[in-house]
C-alpha cells in the first residue's frame, strides 16, 4: 500500500486537476490519496475536499491552523508507518500507470530511497532540458507524452544528487532510518527535500530518476521577492549543513547523465509527426540559447570573481603595509618608553641628590 500525500492550501483549479488526475489513473499498486488541508482559506477548496472525503475517494487531514508545507507533509507521512509514500504537489498532474512505474523503480534496488520522475518544471529533472519552465512541451498532451517516456526509457533509472520534491517517492525503510523532513530549519518549504536526500545519502540510500515517467508541474507563475528571499535563506542553511551540495549538483549538470534519455524521447516525438518534430527542433534551439545565456552568466560571475580577487589582493597588500607600520610604531613606542624610563630615572636621581644637599 502506498500513500499519495497531497498538501493543499490555495489554488482551487490546480488542486482539482491534480486530484482528478490521480483518481483517473489506473494502477496495479494499491494506494490511498491522503490530502492534508493546511487550513486553506479558499472555501471552494474546502467544499471540494469535503465532497471527496464523503464519497470515500480521499483520506482528509485538516490542520487547525496553517502549519506550512513541511509540517503538513510530515503529518501525512506519519499516518501509516508501514507504507511507502509519494509526495505530490497540488499543482501537478499525472497520467497512465505513473505510480506503478515509480514503485517499480523504487523497488528495483534495495538501496534506492527516493525516486523522482521527469517533468516540465523540475530543475535538474526537467524535460526537454534542465532549466525549462515553459509549460507542457509540444502538442501531444500529458497522457501521450508520458506514454512516450514509458516506451522510450522502460525501467531505466539514473542516480541523482538529490530528489525533487514536486513528486517524490520515498521508501518507508529510508524514511524510518533518516527521519522526517526538518521543519525547524526548512519550515517554509524550500530545501527540505534536498536536505532529506542528502541525509539519506549519508546513510547509504540513493536518490534516482525514473526515466520512464513524466509528470506535469505547473510551478510558481512568478518568482516573488519573498520567495527569492526564502530560497536564499534555505540555500544558505542547506550549504551550512551540506557544504558539498552545490558542487555535486554542478558536476551532475555538466555530466548530463539524463541527456540520452531526453534524446530518446525527442526521437520518439520527432517520429510522431511533422508538427511535433517542429516543436522538438524549436526546443533544441531554445536549449542552445539557454546554454549560451548560462555561459554568459558564468563568464560574468568569473569576471566578478577575478575583480573580487584583485580587490582582496589589493586589500591584503594594504593590510601588510598597515601591519608593518603598526609594528614600526610599536617598536618606536617601546624605544620611546625605554628612553622615558631612563629620563625619569635620571631626574629621580638628580632630585634625590638635590634633596640630600638641601637637608645638609
Regions found by a protein language model. Give the residues of each.
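Conserved donor NDP-sugar-binding/catalytic core segment of glycosyltransferases
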Residues: 93-134
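Boundary detector for helix-to-coil junctions that initiate low-complexity/charged tails
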Residues: 244, 251-360
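A recurrent flexible, glycine/aromatic-enriched loop bordering the glycosyltransferase active site
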Residues: 70, 121, 134-173
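A conserved hydrophobic helix/loop-capping motif in glycosyltransferases and polysaccharide synthases
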Residues: 2-14, 18, 25-26, 36, ...
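A short, conserved alpha-helix in the catalytic core of glycosyltransferases
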Residues: 97-103, 159-179, 184-216
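Acidic donor-binding segment of Leloir-type glycosyltransferases
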Residues: 23-62
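Short aromatic/hydrophobic "clamp" motif used to bind/position activated sugar donors
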Residues: 85
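Glycine-rich, basic loop-to-helix element that forms the pyrophosphate-binding segment
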Residues: 63-80, 96
Amino acid at each position: 500500500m502506498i500513500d499519495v500525500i497531497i498538501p493543499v492550501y490555495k489554488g482551487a483549479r490546480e488542486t482539482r486537476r491534480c486530484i482528478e488526475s490521480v483518481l483517473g489513473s489506473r494502477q496495479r499498486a494499491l494506494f490511498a490519496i491522503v490530502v492534508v488541508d493546511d487550513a486553506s482559506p479558499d472555501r471552494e477548496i474546502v467544499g471540494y475536499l469535503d465532497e471527496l472525503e464523503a464519497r470515500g475517494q480521499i483520506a482528509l487531514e485538516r490542520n487547525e491552523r496553517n502549519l506550512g508545507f513541511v509540517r503538513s507533509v510530515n503529518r501525512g507521512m506519519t499516518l501509516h508507518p508501514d507504507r511507502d509514500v509519494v509526495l505530490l504537489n497540488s499543482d501537478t498532474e499525472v497520467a497512465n500507470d505513473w505510480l506503478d512505474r515509480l514503485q517499480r523503480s523504487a523497488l528495483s534496488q534495495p538501496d534506492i530511497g527516493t525516486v523522482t520522475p521527469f517533468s516540465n518544471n523540475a530543475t535538474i529533472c526537467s524535460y526537454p532540458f534542465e532549466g525549462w519552465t515553459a509549460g507542457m512541451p509540444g502538442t501531444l498532451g500529458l497522457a501521450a507524452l508520458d506514454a512516450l517516456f514509458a516506451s522510450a526509457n522502460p525501467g531505466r533509472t539514473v542516480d541523482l544528487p538529490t530528489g525533487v520534491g514536486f513528486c517524490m517517492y520515498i521508501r518507508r525503510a529510508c524514511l524510518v532510518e533518516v527521519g522526517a523532513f526538518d521543519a525547524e530549519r526548512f519550515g517554509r518549504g524550500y530545501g527540505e527535500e534536498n536536505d532529506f536526500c542528502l541525509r539519506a545519502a549519508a546513510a547509504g540510500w540513493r536518490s534516482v530518476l525514473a526515466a520512464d515517467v513524466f509528470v506535469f508541474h505547473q510551478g510558481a507563475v512568478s518568482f516573488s521577492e519573498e520567495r527569492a528571499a526564502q530560497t536564499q535563506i534555505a540555500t544558505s542553511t542547506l550549504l551550512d549543513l551540506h557544504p558539498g551540495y552545490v558542487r555535486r549538483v554542478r558536476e551532475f549538470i555538466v555530466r548530463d547523465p539524463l541527456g540520452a534519455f531526453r534524446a530518446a524521447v525527442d526521437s520518439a516525438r520527432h517520429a510522431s509527426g511533422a508538427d511535433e518534430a517542429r516543436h522538438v527542433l524549436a526546443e533544441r534551439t531554445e536549449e542552445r540559447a539557454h546554454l549560451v545565456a548560462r555561459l554568459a552568466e558564468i563568464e560574468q560571475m568569473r569576471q566578478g570573481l577575478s575583480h573580487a580577487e584583485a580587490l582582496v589582493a589589493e586589500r591584503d597588500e594594504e593590510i601588510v603595509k598597515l601591519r608593518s607600520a603598526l609594528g614600526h610604531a610599536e617598536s618606536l613606542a617601546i624605544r620611546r618608553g625605554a628612553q622615558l624610563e631612563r629620563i625619569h630615572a635620571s631626574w629621580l636621581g638628580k632630585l634625590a641628590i638635590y634633596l640630600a644637599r638641601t637637608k645638609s
